[in-house]
C-alpha cells in the first residue's frame, strides 16, 4: 500500500499533500481507446486464431498437458477450444502480492496498482564520461543500487544489463545474488534456462525464509517472451514450467513488431498478441491452477525502410492503450509501456519518445511498468543518465497520482481570492504562504531558474546534471544489509552451482 512519508509534516504542509513513496495507486479513469464492440471483435479474432491456426509449443511437457486436456495436438502445433482457454484464464487471480526481502517493499499487482521496474536486457551500457561499451557485473550492481536508492522504482528488475564479463552459463547466479544483496525490493527471475529458473527459486527460498514461504506469497516474477508469431520455444517454456510449478508469477509477453512479426494492421496485431498471451496463461494454469499470470505486451511497429523496431511512435502509444483494455477484458494484471525510445543518446528524441510511451502507460492503467528507467537504443543500451532523467519523469507521474487535484477548501482557495481581489497578486497571500513550499511539484534535476543564474552555475544541460546525480546516488547508496548467515548460505550455493555447471559454461 502507498505510505505517507514518515514523521511530522514540515511547517506549512497542508493535510491534502501526500508523498507516495512505496507503490502507486492509479485512480485515474482508464482511457478506453476501443469501444466495447471493438474489444469483442478483437477477442473473437483471437479465439479464431487459437481455434483455426493454433500455437506451436516446442516443449514435450507442454504438448502433453494440452493433449491430456483434450486439445488437438499435431506435431508441435496446439489448436485450442475457446471455452477451455477462457476457463483456464479465469483461474488466474486479478490481483496478487509480490513479496520483498523487506516486507515494507512488498507490492500488489493488478487492479489500480502501478509497479515500476528498470530497463531489462541491454548488452551495452553508456554514461557521459565512458561512452558506449559492453556491460559488466559492476554495471549490473550499479543499476541495482540506483534502483534501491530511488523510491520511484518499486521492483529491482531482472536482467537490467547483460554482464558480458561473466560466463554465460553461470552469470545468472551473480545477477540474482546482486538483486538479493544490494536491494531489498522484489526482483525478476532468470529465464535463460530451466536450470536458471530453478537456481533463482532456490536462492529466493534461502533469502526469504524457505520454499514454503515463497509459494504461499510469491517472491519472484519472471518475463516469459513468446517467439512471435505464434510460437513458444523450449528455453522459455522450461523456465515457465519451473516458475509455475513453484507458484511464482509469470508475465507472458508476445514480442510483436507490426509489419514483421505481426500484421501491419494494429487491430490484427492486438488480436495476435491476445491469442499468444492467453495460450501461455492457459498453460500456466494447467501446470498449477491459480498461479499469478500477467498479460504482457511488447508491441510496436517496424520501420519499414530500415527493418528496425521503432519505439515511442503513435503505434506504440495506441498499442499500449488497446492492449491494456484487452487485459482488463479478461480481468488480468497487465504489463506494458515504459520509457521506450529508439534514440541512441539521452537527447530530445529520447525524451519525447519516452513520454509518448509513458502517458498511455499511465492513462491505460498499466500495472507492471518494465523499462521505466534507463532504456536507450531500442533496448540495446542502458544509460546511467537516462535512468536519472526517467526517474524525474516518474516523479512527475507520482505527483499526479499521489497529489491529484484536490477540490476542497484548500484546493479551491476562496479565502485567497477574497484576500487578493481584482488587480492584485497572490505571492504574499496567506494561502500562498501556507503552501508555497509543498503546493507544487519541485523538480529533481530539471532547471526552472532564469538564464543568468543558469549561466552563472555552468550552463549545465540535463545530461550533465543527470551524470552528477547518478554519481551522487551511488556515493550515498543506502545499503539495506543482509543477514550474515543468509549471505553465507547464498555464497555457498553459488559456489556449488558454479562447480556443477562448469566455470566456462
Which role does the model predict for each range below?
Residues 19, 33-45, 53, 58-65, ...:
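Catalytic-core signal marking the mid-to-C-terminal active-site face
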Residues 21-26, 67-70, 219, 257, ...:
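Short acidic (Asp/Glu) and glycine-rich catalytic loops that position anionic groups and cofactors
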Residues 223-393:
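Glycine-rich anion/phosphate-binding loop at the beta-strand->alpha-helix junction
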Residues 2-16:
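Histidine-centered active-site loop/cap adjacent to the catalytic His
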Residues 79-254, 258-263, 267:
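Catalytic alpha/beta active-site cores
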Residues 11-12, 18-127, 469:
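N-terminal leader/transition segments
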Residues 11, 37, 41, 57, ...:
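Conserved active-site and cofactor/substrate-binding residues in soluble primary-metabolism enzymes
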Amino acid at each position: 500500500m502507498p505510505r505517507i512519508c514518515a514523521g511530522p509534516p514540515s511547517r506549512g504542509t497542508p493535510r491534502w499533500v501526500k508523498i507516495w513513496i512505496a507503490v502507486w495507486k492509479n485512480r485515474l479513469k482508464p482511457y478506453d481507446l476501443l469501444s466495447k464492440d471493438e474489444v469483442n471483435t478483437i477477442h473473437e479474432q483471437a479465439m479464431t486464431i487459437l481455434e483455426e491456426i493454433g500455437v506451436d509449443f516446442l516443449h514435450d511437457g507442454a504438448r502433453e498437458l494440452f493433449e491430456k486436456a483434450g486439445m488437438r495436438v499435431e506435431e508441435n502445433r496446439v489448436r485450442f477450444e475457446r471455452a477451455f482457454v477462457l476457463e483456464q484464464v479465469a483461474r488466474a487471480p486479478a490481483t496478487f502480492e509480490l513479496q520483498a526481502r523487506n516486507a515494507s517493499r512488498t507490492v500488489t499487482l493488478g487492479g489500480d496498482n502501478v509497479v515500476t521496474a528498470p530497463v531489462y536486457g541491454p548488452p551495452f551500457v553508456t554514461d557521459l564520461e565512458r561512452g558506449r561499451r559492453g556491460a559488466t557485473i559492476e554495471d549490473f550492481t550499479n543499476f541495482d543500487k540506483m534502483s534501491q536508492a530511488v523510491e520511484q522504482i518499486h521492483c529491482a528488475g531482472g536482467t537490467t544489463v547483460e554482464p558480458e564479463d561473466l560466463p554465460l552459463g553461470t552469470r545468472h547466479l551473480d545477477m540474482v545474488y546482486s538483486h538479493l544483496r544490494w536491494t531489498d525490493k522484489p526482483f525478476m527471475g532468470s529465464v535463460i534456462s530451466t536450470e536458471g529458473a530453478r537456481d533463482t527459486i532456490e536462492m529466493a527460498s534461502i533469502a526469504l525464509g524457505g520454499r514454503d514461504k515463497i509459494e504461499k506469497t510469491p517472491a519472484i516474477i519472471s518475463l516469459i517472451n513468446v517467439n512471435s508469431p505464434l510460437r513458444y520455444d523450449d528455453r522459455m517454456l522450461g523456465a515457465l514450467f519451473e516458475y509455475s510449478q513453484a507458484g511464482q508469477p509469470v508475465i507472458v509477453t508476445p514480442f510483436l513488431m507490426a509489419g514483421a512479426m505481426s500484421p501491419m494492421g494494429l487491430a490484427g496485431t492486438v488480436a495476435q498478441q491476445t491469442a499468444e498471451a492467453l495460450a501461455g496463461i492457459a498453460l500456466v494454469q494447467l501446470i498449477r491452477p491459480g498461479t499469478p499470470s500477467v498479460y504482457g505486451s511488447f508491441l510496436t511497429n517496424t520501420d519499414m525502410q530500415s527493418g528496425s523496431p521503432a519505439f515511442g511512435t503513435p503505434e506504440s502509444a495506441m498499442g499500449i492503450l488497446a492492449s491494456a483494455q484487452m487485459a482488463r477484458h479478461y480481468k488480468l494484471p497487465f504489463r506494458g509501456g515504459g520509457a521506450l525510445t529508439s534514440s541512441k543518446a539521452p537527447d530530445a528524441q529520447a525524451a519525447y519518445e519516452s513520454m509518448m510511451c509513458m502517458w498511455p502507460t499511465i492513462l491505460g492503467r498499466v500495472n507492471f511498468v518494465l523499462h521505466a528507467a534507463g532504456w536507450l537504443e531500442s533496448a540495446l543500451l542502458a544509460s546511467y543518465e537516462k535512468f536519472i532523467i526517467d526517474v524525474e519523469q516518474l516523479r512527475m507521474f507520482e505527483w499526479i497520482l499521489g497529489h491529484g487535484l484536490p477540490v476542497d477548501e484548500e484546493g479551491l482557495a476562496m479565502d485567497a481570492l477574497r484576500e487578493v481581489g481584482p488587480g492584485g497578486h497572490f505571492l504574499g497571500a496567506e494561502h500562498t504562504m501556507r503552501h508555497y513550499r509543498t503546493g507544487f511539484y519541485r523538480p529533481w534535476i530539471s532547471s526552472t531558474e532564469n538564464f543568468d543564474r543558469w549561466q552563472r552555475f555552468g550552463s549545465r544541460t540535463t545530461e550533465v546534471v543527470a551524470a552528477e546525480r547518478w554519481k551522487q546516488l551511488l556515493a550515498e547508496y543506502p545499503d539495506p544489509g543482509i543477514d550474515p548467515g543468509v549471505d553465507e548460505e547464498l555464497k555457498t550455493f553459488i559456489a556449488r552451482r558454479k562447480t556443477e555447471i562448469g566455470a566456462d559454461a
